[in-house]
Design a protein with these regions (language model features):
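Substrate-binding pocket helix/loop in short-chain dehydrogenase/reductase
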Residues: 90-91, 98-100
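Residue(s) in the substrate-gating loop at a strand-loop-helix junction
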Residues: 134
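Conserved glycine-rich cofactor-binding loop
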Residues: 13-14
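C-terminal beta-strand-loop-alpha-helix "lid" module of Rossmann-like NAD(P)-dependent dehydrogenases
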Residues: 166-216
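Active-site helix of classical SDR
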Residues: 114, 150-153
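The beta1-alpha1 cofactor-binding region of Rossmann-like NAD(H)/NADP(H)-dependent oxidoreductases
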Residues: 54-64, 96
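A glycine-rich helix->loop->beta "capping" turn
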Residues: 68-81, 87
Length: 273
């Protein structure tokens, strides 16, 4: 496909986004790394990566960033929508404002980025939109109701988008990482740990927190973000990319279990984890 295209990455201040920015830059792409935490992008500048401020929940911020990139480069070949986070806690206990904020970042902000990039890609007659979903977009886990709802929604959104954009030569790809060593788990842990001590779900929360402390927060479980970066590169270079790519720890096991196990069997396994 393209040799040196222009790639725009959201959520590029850490983890998957930052690793992908570094990897694609080394492969010869012109990379724009977008994030709110500009201080976290400074070390990317010596690599030739161009940092820009972006708040995906702010219309003006999106418009300004895309306009600056287009005026400088004259094109945008790839949009990698990676900004997102996980909100974990009992559905009953999570404040609805927090739940709406989850959707604003994980779905509506992503959709707004796409709406601003599409006219550019359509005018080019080509482009790729890569959306970061998760195995959590196919398999729901304990306390993850609002996060999973946002990712399940993203899966359906991306499927419809893919069909709509085919006529314009624009491809849509979903990536479904498993457990990756990023700040994701720390943030989910922090929120869940602040749930009211009088919650009727305290035993459940304690169970999940213990599992998180044992496996995820210690770094014992999870793949290096570079595995995602390599898959994103593969999807960009592919003439006919897959509609979905899965990678990372537990992704194959979790998605296979979802396909072959009855719902109640999977519920039992997830409750015991």
């Amino acid at each position: 496909m393209m040799k040196n295209g222009v790639v725009v990455i959201t959520g590029a201040s850490s983890g998957i986004g930052k690793s992908t920015a570094e990897y694609l830059s080394k492969k010869g792409f012109t990379v724009y790394a977008l994030a709110r935490r500009m201080d976290k992008l400074e070390d990317l500048i010596p690599l030739g990566i161009k940092p820009l401020f972006l708040d995906v929940t702010n219309e003006t911020s999106i418009k300004v960033a895309i306009q600056e990139i287009y005026e400088t480069e004259g094109r945008i070949d790839v949009l990698f929508n990676n900004a997102g986070y996980g909100l974990y806690g009992p559905i009953e206990d999570v404040d609805l404002k927090d739940a709406r904020d989850q959707f604003e970042v994980n779905l509506f902000g992503l959709a707004n980025m796409i709406k601003h990039v599409l006219p550019i890609m359509r005018n080019q007659g080509s482009g790729k939109i890569i959306n970061t979903s998760s195995i959590g977009g196919k398999v729901a886990s304990l306390l993850g109701g609002w996060y999973h709802a946002s990712k399940f929604a993203l899966e359906g959104f991306s499927d419809s988008l893919r069909i709509e954009l085919k006529q314009f030569g624009i491809q849509v790809v979903l990536i479904q990482p498993g457990l990756i060593k990023t700040e994701f788990m720390q943030r989910t842990y922090d929120y869940a740990s602040k749930i009211d001590a009088q919650s009727p779900y305290q035993d459940t929360i304690a169970h999940v927190m213990k599992s998180a402390e044992r496996d995820y927060l210690t770094g014992k479980v999870g793949s290096n973000p570079i595995v995602v970066a390599k898959v994103v590169y593969k999807a960009i270079k592919a003439r006919r990319p897959k509609t979905r790519y899965r990678m990372g720890k537990l992704s194959f096991i979790a998605l296979t279990a979802r396909k072959i196990l009855p719902d109640k069997w999977l519920d039992y396994i997830l409750l015991k984890r």
